[in-house]
Amino acid sequence: MSRVCQVSGKRVQTGNNVSHANNKTRRRFLPNLHERRFWVASENRWVKLRVSAHALRTIDKNGIDSVLAELRARGEKV
């Protein structure tokens, strides 16, 4: 399973660890992903999504129904 948020599209980024001596080694910045269930009252069912913390705030702000509508418009199976 890929480390990509289903709502916001956040994914793994790459960069450097930088030591005190300014030595650089490659590293990955992982998104803060959580597998969460959301109750969709209009469909009378639970929907399981893999979302980032940023996407959780978006769902709180806009509502799960509008977020699911955007996902379906993108062609994602929910």
Swiss-Prot record:
Polar residues: bias regions: 11-22
Disulphide connectivity of cysteines: none
UniProt cross-references to SUPFAM superfamilies, sorted A to Z: L28p-like
InterPro entries xrefs: Ribosomal_bL28, Ribosomal_bL28/bL31-like_sf, Ribosomal_bL28_bact-type, Ribosomal_bL28_sf
Keyword Ribosomal protein: yes
Protein's GO biological process: translation
GO molecular-function terms, A-Z: structural constituent of ribosome
Gene Ontology CC, one term: cytosolic large ribosomal subunit
Keywords: Ribonucleoprotein, Ribosomal protein
Region spans: Disordered: 1-23
Family: Belongs to the bacterial ribosomal protein bL28 family.
PANTHER family: 39S RIBOSOMAL PROTEIN L28, MITOCHONDRIAL (PTHR13528), LARGE RIBOSOMAL SUBUNIT PROTEIN BL28M (PTHR13528:SF2)
Protein's UniProt name: Large ribosomal subunit protein bL28
Gene expressing this chain: rpmB
